[in-house]
């Protein structure tokens, strides 16, 4: 059997970059990874309705003062919902995040800055397209219609190709199966090809459905 490689990890350093960017002493490494997990889980839950595309974390660790300066870049399709009036929404989220981290990880000198980045082409973003399929499946929309809709949106937005795969008890049938559709080209083995990928889970009354989306962008 052929083994599949994660499309994003396969292209790190070529067309993709790491979503966490920092360096720290070995004894602090585990605590920084925990902080990353807490930040991502909090943002994905708190900002669910803002259509998050990507969360990037950068750190500048000051060894002399043992202080952690963290910058969180939140890429969303609806930035106005995050920022709020006069930036109050963003400040509230940052304060809640600091309280959550102090509660779960203990109080340490940390400075967190949140910056919002708007997504210019949401219909070419694999995560946003997968989120759209998930919402439709949870509304009990037929899976073929949900898949074809996002594929049409992506191709109209200028994608070179898109592949969407859904697996599980499709339309509530007893036996689980996998269905996929592809439009255009999706060259997974070409390293210089800009492939965006995301996998998501839809919770339905029949069980869990797995969703995978590949988008080939020029």
Curated annotation (Swiss-Prot):
PANTHER family: 30S/40S RIBOSOMAL PROTEIN S3 (PTHR11760), SMALL RIBOSOMAL SUBUNIT PROTEIN US3C (PTHR11760:SF19)
InterPro entries: KH_dom-like_a/b, KH_dom_type_2, KH_sf_prok-type, Ribosomal_S3_C_sf, Ribosomal_uS3_bac-typ, Ribosomal_uS3_C, Ribosomal_uS3_CS
Residue span, KH type-2 domain: 39-120
Cell compartment(s), UniProt: Plastid, Chloroplast
Keyword check for Plastid: yes
Quaternary context: Part of the 30S ribosomal subunit.
GO molecular function, one term: rRNA binding
UniProt-recorded name of the protein: Small ribosomal subunit protein uS3c
Biological process annotations from GO: translation
The keyword Repeat belongs to this UniProt entry's keyword annotation: no
The family this protein is said to belong to: Belongs to the universal ribosomal protein uS3 family.
């Amino acid at each position: 059997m052929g083994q599949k490689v994660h499309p994003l990890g396969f292209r790190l350093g070529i067309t993709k970059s790491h979503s966490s960017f920092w360096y720290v002493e070995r004894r602090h490494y585990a605590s920084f990874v925990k902080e990353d997990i807490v930040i991502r889980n909090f943002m994905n839950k708190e900002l669910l309705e803002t259509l998050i595309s990507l969360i990037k974390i950068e750190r500048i660790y000051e060894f002399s003062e043992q202080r952690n300066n963290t910058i969180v870049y939140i890429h969303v399709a609806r930035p106005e919902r995050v920022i709020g009036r006069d930036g109050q929404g963003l400040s509230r989220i940052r304060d809640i995040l600091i309280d959550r981290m102090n509660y779960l990880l203990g109080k340490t000198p940390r400075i967190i800055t949140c910056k919002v980045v708007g997504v210019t082409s949401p219909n070419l973003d694999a995560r946003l397209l997968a989120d759209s399929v998930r919402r439709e499946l949870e509304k009990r929309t037929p899976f073929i219609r949900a898949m074809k809709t996002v594929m049409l949106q992506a191709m109209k937005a200028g994608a070179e190709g898109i592949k969407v795969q859904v697996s599980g008890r499709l339309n509530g049938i007893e036996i689980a199966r996998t269905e996929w559709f592809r439009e255009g080209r999706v060259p997974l083995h070409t390293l210089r090809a800009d492939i965006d990928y995301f996998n998501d889970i839809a919770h339905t009354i029949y069980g869990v459905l797995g969703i995978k989306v590949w988008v080939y962008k020029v």
